[in-house]
């Protein structure tokens, strides 16, 4: 199913009973977070707050609060079907020419979808129906949520930040949180390895001291939003991937104050620049770890223009101890990771990022083990293959008889197939999430790999245990008798 814009998606969710309109007056300061959090933990609907206290603009939260809604936003019926999206990305990351008629036929759906990758330019976009600039710009009029009692200021959480470096043809779209500083100032909190930060550094190399143009889209269509959080190849534009997801070309328009392309159907657009050297302390904020983060200096964005649709909707979220919206997205995106990893490492059977691990800090993987040391190869392969796993602190590798999504199975494998000294690999001085205060140095820490596989000759000199399995014929006989025995009724 295709969704041309956020409003189209809202309408479809409402028809399915997956969106609830809140007509009571609710304060964006803390109250919306509490309602959204209770709703998400109960597996409830997306929420449209129609009467935010002190503001005229309605607020949409919990949009991706269930894996079902994430799948729908990606044009799929359920989360399991997202593996097909992963297969597209695996192919686009390392394309192979068809090896015959059968191969051509199998790849035909991908080739057809590629036609939707180029963007479509729009001259009079909906996102520029209302234009404000200069003294008319006032970000304090937006119902920006303050999510937790210790948060220093209101925080923009779903800002789709658009940048372009001097060396790349494509633009970068990334989601970075943005602290409200004043009427026309926000802090751009991006980590040094993220696309926007890389573009900014390269810009300063070529244009020292000159302002760096930036546009921020709030409330883009769901395919474009999810394109910015999906592990696409570095050479692929998020707009192009959104076209693949949507099944139609992404509509973009030129920003008013710069040459950046913005989502034409977005609800609200912020345009402006980063002046090199202008920084401000960011935070503290409650984050997806369940803790408040440290205060650190980040670049300040000066907003020169605000454009929006008539009667815009403000898209927002909160982050906190899982489950929250980022962790739900992580569960859904997990299905996309599996085919990408399997293309590089065919021995991988399954891969799982437990949501309790704050989306990416722990991974459990099962493999068809083929030789001594195989588990260690897979550990280092995962850490280095995709940028998303640079910050994964713990990787547990199991055999293919272990269900990596069942902690009962995983803990059994750890406790019966591991020796803590022999089967634990520690790596020092590796990149770690800036928000990880447990690391000894900000942004730098260690990683642990755990080999919970059966050990082969060369890995252990002892006779290895054989798992207990019931005789197959006995199981079949009892299967036939089970209902008649009437034991559990």
From Swiss-Prot:
Cofactor info, note text: Binds 1 prenylated FMN per subunit.
GO BP terms: ubiquinone biosynthetic process
GO molecular function: 3-octaprenyl-4-hydroxybenzoate carboxy-lyase activity; metal ion binding
Keyword Zinc: no
Residue numbers binding prenylated FMN: 175-177, 189-191, 194-195
Signal peptide range in chain numbering: none
Ligand binding (Mn(2+)): 172, 238
Superkingdom of the source species: Bacteria
EC number: 4.1.1.98
Compartmental location: Cell membrane
UniProt membrane topology term: Peripheral membrane protein
Catalysed reactions, as listed in the record: a 4-hydroxy-3-(all-trans-polyprenyl)benzoate + H(+) = a 2-(all-trans-polyprenyl)phenol + CO2
Job of this protein: Catalyzes the decarboxylation of 3-octaprenyl-4-hydroxy benzoate to 2-octaprenylphenol, an intermediate step in ubiquinone biosynthesis.
Subunit note: Homohexamer.
Family: Belongs to the UbiD family.
NCBIfam families: PRK10922.1 (NF008175), UbiD family decarboxylase (TIGR00148)
Record-given protein name: 3-octaprenyl-4-hydroxybenzoate carboxy-lyase
Native organism: Psychromonas ingrahamii (strain DSM 17664 / CCUG 51855 / 37)
Gene that specifies this protein: ubiD
């Amino acid at each position: 199913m295709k969704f041309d814009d956020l409003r189209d998606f809202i309408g479809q969710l409402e028809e399915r009973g997956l969106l609830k309109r809140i007509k009571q007056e609710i304060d964006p300061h803390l109250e919306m977070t509490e309602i959204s959090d209770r709703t998400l933990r109960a597996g409830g609907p997306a929420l449209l707050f129609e009467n935010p206290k002190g503001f005229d603009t309605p607020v949409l939260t919990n949009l991706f609060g269930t894996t079902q809604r994430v799948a729908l936003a990606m044009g799929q019926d359920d989360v399991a079907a997202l593996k097909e999206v992963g297969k597209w990305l695996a192919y686009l990351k390392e394309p192979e020419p068809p090896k015959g008629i059968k191969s051509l036929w199998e790849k035909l759906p991908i080739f057809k979808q590629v036609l939707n990758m180029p963007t479509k330019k729009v001259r009079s976009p909906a996102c520029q129906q209302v234009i404000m600039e200069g003294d008319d710009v006032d970000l304090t009029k937006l119902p920006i949520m303050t999510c937790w009692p210790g948060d220093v200021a209101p925080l923009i959480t779903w800002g789709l930040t658009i940048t372009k470096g001097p060396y790349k043809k494509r633009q970068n779209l990334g989601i970075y949180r943005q602290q409200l500083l004043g009427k026309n100032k926000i802090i751009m909190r991006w980590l040094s390895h993220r696309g926007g930060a890389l573009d900014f550094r390269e810009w300063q190399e070529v244009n020292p001291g000159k302002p760096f143009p930036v546009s921020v889209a709030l409330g883009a269509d769901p395919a474009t939003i999810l394109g910015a959080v999906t592990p696409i190849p570095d050479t692929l534009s998020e707009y192009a991937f959104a076209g693949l997801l949507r099944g139609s070309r992404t509509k973009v328009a030129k920003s008013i104050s710069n040459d950046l392309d913005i989502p034409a159907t977005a609800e609200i657009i912020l345009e402006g620049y980063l002046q090199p050297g202008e920084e401000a302390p960011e935070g503290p904020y409650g984050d997806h770890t369940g803790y408040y983060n440290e205060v650190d200096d980040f670049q300040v964005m000066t907003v020169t223009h605000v454009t929006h649709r008539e009667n815009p909707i403000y898209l927002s979220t909160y982050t906190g101890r899982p489950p929250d919206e980022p962790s739900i997205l992580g569960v859904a995106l997990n299905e996309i990771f599996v085919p990408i990893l399997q293309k590089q490492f065919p021995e991988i059977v399954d891969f799982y990022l437990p949501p309790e691990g704050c989306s990416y800090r722990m991974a459990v993987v099962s493999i068809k083990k083929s030789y001594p040391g195989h588990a260690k190869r897979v550990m280092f392969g995962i850490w280095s293959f995709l940028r998303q796993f640079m910050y994964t602190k713990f990787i547990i590798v199991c055999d293919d008889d272990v269900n990596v999504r069942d902690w009962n199975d995983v803990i059994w494998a750890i406790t019966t197939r591991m020796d803590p000294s022999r089967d634990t690999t520690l790596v020092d001085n590796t990149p770690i999430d800036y928000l990880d205060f447990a690391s000894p140095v900000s942004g730098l820490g260690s990683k642990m790999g755990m080999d919970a596989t059966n050990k082969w000759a060369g890995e252990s000199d002892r006779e290895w245990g054989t798992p207990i399995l019931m005789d197959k014929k006995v199981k079949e006989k009892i299967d036939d008798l089970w209902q008649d025995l009437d034991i559990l009724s």
